Structures are given as structure tokens and as C-alpha cells.
């Protein structure tokens, strides 16, 4: 059954992916008179570019083909952003048909500018997002307890040592009491990213680093994540809770992707079974789902990631339609959920209308 689901997903994703290519091609040729030679050239570019992403994905574990993988991700981002711009161009052309040709040329220029901006955006280090969250059950002497929330780092063989070193430096400057990571830490096999655990061991917090799995940990093999975490001095929470500084509980559940690999999925009831007192409970859950149920079980704060805040067009527009708590801080009764845009990137090395972030959370006794 998992194999059948995978084949179905690949077929649907492939159809959508190449459909985007055809749409852009169609949008151009129906608006501008082009010679047969130019049309053929565009078709060849679309086919080769489209195949570069799939070829890179299938061959991503092979060394020496990094250029193909990276180029494929760049192409994926270019197509996604361009599709969005051309789609809105075609809607506008319905009302302004006499300007269709001009709008098409303008769309080409806007696409180039947007793609360039998206690439330049990720050259910047993650921004620091500082928030304060009221915590009614937190002892007054613990007010100001500082948590650094990271998520979706997606460490792979494209990740640079300099980027990790900068991340560690920026986190340590915040002098956190606790570092919490909500999944998708790695996106590769351990033997291809083994230089990073020694760098991540330099993360400093008074009460350690705790982490849960994301969906990508299962795609590459959960054992790589577990070994990577152990080497990095990360404590993995798998349907379990830990008491921190005798003032709050941190509960971690695995991503629901675990069930697709015949592994135990998230079980919040089991994870909270041994919590008997009235101290605040912080839940680590990769996807920003299940928050109302978590509140009913006594969770004070849920930390999540996964959405990347869309990362690029058109996902920026679609993610809020898919996830109710897609980005930022939300309140329900006296509990909160914070969904981060992510510390790193997945796929295209681009961001537009969103930034990578390090989240610094001060818990305020109330």
C-alpha cells in the first residue's frame, strides 16, 4: 500500500509539474507571434529544465552530480514563480485583451526580477524574531525564561559550514535557557553531512537542545536523524515528556509521516501520561495541526514549523488555505501556537515575501 501511494503521488506531482511548464509556454506563444525555431527552442529549454529536477531527485544520493541537483532546484523555483506571475497576467488579460502582448513582455521582466530577488534573499542569515508569550502557570521567579525555536533546517550536502557556524553564533548570542527544534533537521544521509554535528554541539543553552522528527527525517531514513541527533547532543522526544528546570514540561511527538513507514505515529495522550502537576506544557509538533485538541489536553504553547510560510510563489498563497495556523502566533483560550517560517530552506534556494528566522521566545509569568 505505501508503494502504491508513492507511485500515485509521483504520477500526480509529475503531471502538475509538467503542466506548469506547458502553461507558461502556452501563455507566451498565444500572446506573442514567434517563429517555429523560437518555439522549438523554448520547448527544448522547458523539457531539459523540467527533467533536470526529476533527474536530480532520482540521482541525489550519487556523488559528483551536485550541479544537476542544484540546477534542478533552481529550475523548480523559477517555474513556480513564473507560473504565478503568468497566471495573474492571463487573468488581467481577460479584462485588458488589447494589452495582452505588453503584459506578456512585462511578465517576463517581472519573473526575472522576482527570481533574482528570491535568490538574493536567501544569501542573508536567518532574521531574529523576538516575541513574548504570557504563561499563566509559570512561576513568577521564572518569568523571562528564554526559548530559541528552530525548525526546518534541512541540512544536506549543499549546506555550508559557514552557514551552520553563523546560525550557532546567532543562537548563542541570545543566551537561551532552552533550544527547541521542531523537525526537518536533516535532509540527507548521515555519511554526507557528518561534518555538521561537531559544529552543532557548540549550541549553548542552560537546559540543552530538544528535537522532534519532521516528515523529511523519514524519507531519508529515521536512523540517520537519530544518529545525527545523538552526535549533535540533541535529545529526541518521541511521544514523551521531559521536565525542564522544575518549572515547565516539554512534550515531543513524532511527525505523522511515521505511520506511513510502519512506525509509531504521534500520540499526545501517551506523551503526557506522566504529567501530574499544573506547570506549563510546551508541545513540539512538526506540523501546525491538532492545536485545539492539544489545548484541551492542557498544552500551554505549541511550537511548529513545516510550512516555510510558503517559501516561494505560489505556495505563499496556498499554504494559508491548507493550514489554519500557517505562520506566526495564534491564541486559543489562554494557550498559544507559534508556527515558524523555518530556519533553513527546502528545495529551491529561494525565498520571496518571507524570510528564514530564528525565533526567540520569552515566557512571561502572568
Predicted regions and their residues:
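Soluble catalytic domains of enzymes that build or remodel membrane lipids, polysaccharides, and related
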Residues: 138-366
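Non-catalytic terminal accessory segments
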Residues: 1-124
Amino acid at each position: 500500500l505505501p508503494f502504491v501511494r508513492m507511485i500515485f503521488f509521483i504520477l500526480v506531482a509529475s503531471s502538475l509539474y509538467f503542466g506548469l511548464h506547458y502553461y507558461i509556454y502556452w501563455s507566451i506563444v498565444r500572446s506573442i507571434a514567434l517563429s517555429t525555431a523560437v518555439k522549438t527552442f523554448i520547448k527544448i529549454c522547458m523539457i531539459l529544465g523540467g527533467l533536470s529536477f526529476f533527474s536530480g531527485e532520482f540521482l541525489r544520493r550519487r556523488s559528483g552530480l551536485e550541479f544537476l541537483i542544484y540546477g534542478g532546484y533552481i529550475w523548480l523555483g523559477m517555474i513556480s514563480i513564473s507560473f504565478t506571475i503568468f497566471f495573474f497576467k492571463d487573468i488581467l488579460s481577460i479584462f485588458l485583451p488589447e494589452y495582452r502582448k505588453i503584459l506578456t513582455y512585462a511578465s517576463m521582466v517581472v519573473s526575472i526580477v522576482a527570481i533574482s530577488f528570491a535568490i538574493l534573499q536567501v544569501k542573508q542569515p536567518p532574521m531574529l524574531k523576538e516575541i513574548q508569550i504570557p504563561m499563566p502557570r509559570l512561576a513568577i521567579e521564572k518569568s523571562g525564561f528564554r526559548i530559541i525555536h528552530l525548525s526546518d533546517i534541512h541540512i544536506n550536502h549543499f549546506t555550508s559550514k559557514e552557514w551552520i557556524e553563523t546560525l550557532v553564533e546567532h543562537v548563542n548570542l541570545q543566551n537561551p535557557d532552552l533550544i527547541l527544534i521542531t523537525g526537518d533537521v536533516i535532509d540527507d544521509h548521515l555519511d554526507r553531512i557528518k561534518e555538521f554535528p561537531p559544529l552543532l554541539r557548540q549550541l549553548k543553552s542552560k537546559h540543552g537542545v530538544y528535537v522532534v522528527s519532521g516528515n523529511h527525517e523519514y524519507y531519508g531514513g529515521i536512523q540517520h536523524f537519530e544518529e545525527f541527533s545523538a552526535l549533535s547532543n540533541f535529545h529526541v522526544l518521541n511521544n514523551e515528556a521531559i521536565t525542564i528546570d522544575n518549572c515547565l514540561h516539554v512534550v515531543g511527538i513524532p511527525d505523522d509521516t511515521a505511520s506511513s513507514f510502519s512506525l509509531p505515529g504521534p500520540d499526545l495522550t501517551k506523551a503526557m501520561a506522566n504529567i501530574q502537576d499544573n506547570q506549563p506544557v510546551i508541545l513540539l509538533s512538526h506540523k501546525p495541526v491538532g492545536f485545539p485538541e492539544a489545548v484541551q489536553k492542557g498544552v500551554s504553547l505549541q511550537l511548529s514549523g513545516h510550512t516555510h510560510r510558503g517559501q516561494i510563489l505560489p505556495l505563499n498563497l496556498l499554504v494559508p488555505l491548507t493550514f489554519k495556523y500557517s505562520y506566526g502566533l495564534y491564541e486559543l483560550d489562554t494557550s498559544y501556537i507559534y508556527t515558524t517560517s523555518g530556519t533553513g530552506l527546502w528545495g529551491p534556494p529561494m525565498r520571496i515575501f518571507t524570510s528564514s528566522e530564528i525565533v526567540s521566545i520569552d515566557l512571561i509569568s502572568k
